[in-house]
Amino acid sequence: MQIVQMNTRLDRLSALLEGVAPVFSVIESFDQLGALDLTAPQLDPSLVMVINSLASKYQASPDQPTPPRQSLWIGHLSHWAHLQSKLLVYTREQICIRAQLTGPLGPLLMEEFAQPTDLLTDTHETALSVPMTLIQQEVSHPRCGQPALLKSAGDILFIGILRHLVANPNPERPGLLHALSDVRIAKALVAMHQAPHFNWNLSALALEAGMSRTSFATAFKKAMDKTPGKYLVTLRLALARRALDSGKTVKEAARISGYRNPASIARALKFNVTNKR
């Protein structure tokens, strides 16, 4: 497995997390999860994180000689049926946490989990195991201040998941988290996340990455499976759509998202809808 050494001077996630704005709630059971109306319109897309205590009969393998203490499943809310059939086979107990992505960049992060992700952890992976254990203990034995504690633990666990996926990129799954594992591409992505309204072009983004235009464009496309221009359009459309949904005027939405005028944002939204048909 490839392990990426993180550059502590480059914060790859804070601007993204601010744009995603996750809100966490514990779902008490799979029955409750299945009772949710997935057909109703949802402004905020949702992920589900499932913490599992592995049964003592878990079988070690050459690839996993030391049985993991916990596992973590994360996927779309609509994947819950898959989750039931997959996880109940080998676990004793599950805790389901719903992460509503209330920020404008929520749909972009949802794309990263179009395929459910399984993570096996042990006590050495403290960024994941500590908040998972804390949540398990709190749900099993509630104490005063539980809602605040679960919110904070959910935040810590979610950040730990993203850090883990950025530090352990899957070469077969290009996308945002995979691209953030490359420090050069990450610099350009962070710049776009922090200032989407800036007049970005290929030259400016390549300069942020410290690469030539050609090398940057090629590396970005390989890591993201889309061009820098396409990602910037997707980012700005997400910001514009959320601004309009929240009641802002087209002029305000254009300013927030980086479009030069209301006519530009109207054309972009119309073009995006037409392309999806």
Question: Locations of the language-model features?
Answer:
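Hydrophobic recognition helices of helix-based DNA-binding modules
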Residues: 139, 161-165, 220, 244, ...
